[in-house]
Amino acid sequence: MNETLYCSFCKKPESRDPKKRRIIFASNLNKDVCVCEYCIDVMHGELHKYDSKYDRMDSLLALKRDRLRRMESSAYEEEFLLSRIPAPKELKAVLDNYVIGQEQAKKVFSVAVYNHYKRLSFKEKLKKQDNQDSDLELEHLEEVELSKSNILLIGPTGSGKTLMAQTLAKHLDIPIAISDATSLTEAGYVGEDVENILTRLLQASDWNVQKAQKGIVFIDEIDKISRLSEHRSITRDVSGEGVQQALLKIVEGSLVNIPPKGGRKHPEGNFIQIDTSDILFICAGAFDGLAEIIKKRTTQNVLGFTQEKMSKKEQEAILHLVQTHDLVTYGLIPELIGRLPVLSTLDSISLEAMVDILQKPKNALIKQYQQLFKMDEVDLIFEEEAIKEIAKLALERKTGARGLRAIIEDFCLDIMFDLPKLKGSEVRITKDCVLKQAEPLIIAKTHSKILP
């Protein structure tokens, strides 16, 4: 028999090296069974551990349950291995459907995600080739250790940082956990432990450890845990440098013990162990004041330099010149910055982009509200001037695209309250509805007149 044999229990292949894994093949009642020597040793030990046949039966059932768990785990790995990883252009095209503008950031993000999961796919191929003779090319590739491409996103609130991560995670069918760094504290203090981030990822993975270990962790407001100076603090900093040190452990890749089902840690309790080596970490923040640090560095040798307030365009342009030392000066520890090698900046949203965000993406807010009204057989129309005023209001509030829903909810609340009564009508949102809280125009289609 020339084909490679696989153990029917642990699913491991037979080694061509006689000193390694050997497999016994048996055919009985038209059913082929293969058992490796390691599984035979395990079963032999379990069967002789008990005296009664009932204890032996319980032991065999336990072995079967353990085998099913391992099969489920390996099935996910196999599924991930065989699934085609979309090219960066395909990933960017997906982002284009939901994120307006930010072209450079979307390119950087797509390439980083592609390289990360290509790395995981390669690692799984190496596992599958374990105990088998590989070709010269594979042996050459084994000598190269591929590092993780964790990402640091710098951009104002509502510019699309979180949305990009959520969009690709959904497209790739990968679990994602989103956390706010401002709520994190060092272990032992009031607040949220860093390990709770991984608990959220496990919950998003339906407590499937293998699936969680290939997921995405998004940590927002990372700039809010910066230390106050470049020099190491001699006092206890439970929500700044201390949290950065705790994050460093899980971001760089380590085995972390998580309480089962999100419970609290107990010295004698059981733990779920997660390897963070293959989890993609994305950290993001607005980094207010970083532009001034970069400007000071880039203009320090210019005679007659005076501190002048920069315009928005100048701030966006200078942020693209950010270097590691600027982030250290801002308050991030060098070790953490080193674990976030992919850096991208996002621009603030312009008025034109905000108008497009309201209308063009697949999940555009205007499309969502029109669909909600259509469920009650009511047509919702937004006039162009009204859309512009909504965009202007969001820019004035400095909430980015995130604040658009609150603005629309404000003037649509009363009309949605009476929506079931307006079946067969048309509701028109005008400029005055946004600026002066005027009532929307309600037009009865059948009578073609404005209702009081």
From Swiss-Prot:
Superkingdom in the source lineage: Bacteria
Q: Example GO biological process term?
A: proteolysis involved in protein catabolic process
Q: Where does ATP bind?
A: 156-163
- GO MF annotations, alphabetized: ATP binding; ATP hydrolysis activity; ATP-dependent protein folding chaperone; protein dimerization activity; unfolded protein binding; zinc ion binding
Q: Per the database record, which ranges form the ClpX-type ZB domain?
A: 1-55
Alphabetic keyword roster: ATP-binding, Chaperone, Metal-binding, Nucleotide-binding, Zinc
Enumerate the residues binding Zn(2+): 7, 10, 36, 39
Q: Which PROSITE patterns match?
A: CLPX_ZB (PS51902)
Quote a single Gene Ontology cellular component term.
HslUV protease complex
| NCBIfam families registered for this protein in UniProt | clpX, PRK05342.1
Q: What HAMAP family does the database record attribute to this sequence?
A: ClpX
Recorded hits in PANTHER family, A to Z, give: ATP-DEPENDENT CLP PROTEASE ATP-BINDING SUBUNIT CLPX-LIKE, MITOCHONDRIAL, ATP-DEPENDENT CLP PROTEASE ATP-BINDING SUBUNIT CLPX-LIKE, MITOCHONDRIAL-RELATED
Query: How would you summarize the oligomeric state and partners of this protein?
Result: Component of the ClpX-ClpP complex. Forms a hexameric ring that, in the presence of ATP, binds to fourteen ClpP subunits assembled into a disk-like structure with a central cavity, resembling the structure of eukaryotic proteasomes.
Q: What does this protein do?
A: ATP-dependent specificity component of the Clp protease. It directs the protease to specific substrates. Can perform chaperone functions in the absence of ClpP.
Q: Which family does it belong to?
A: Belongs to the ClpX chaperone family.
The name under which this protein is listed is ATP-dependent Clp protease ATP-binding subunit ClpX
Give the organism, scientific name.
Helicobacter pylori (strain J99 / ATCC 700824)
The top of its lineage is:
Bacteria, Pseudomonadati, Campylobacterota, Epsilonproteobacteria, Campylobacterales
Q: Which gene encodes it?
A: clpX
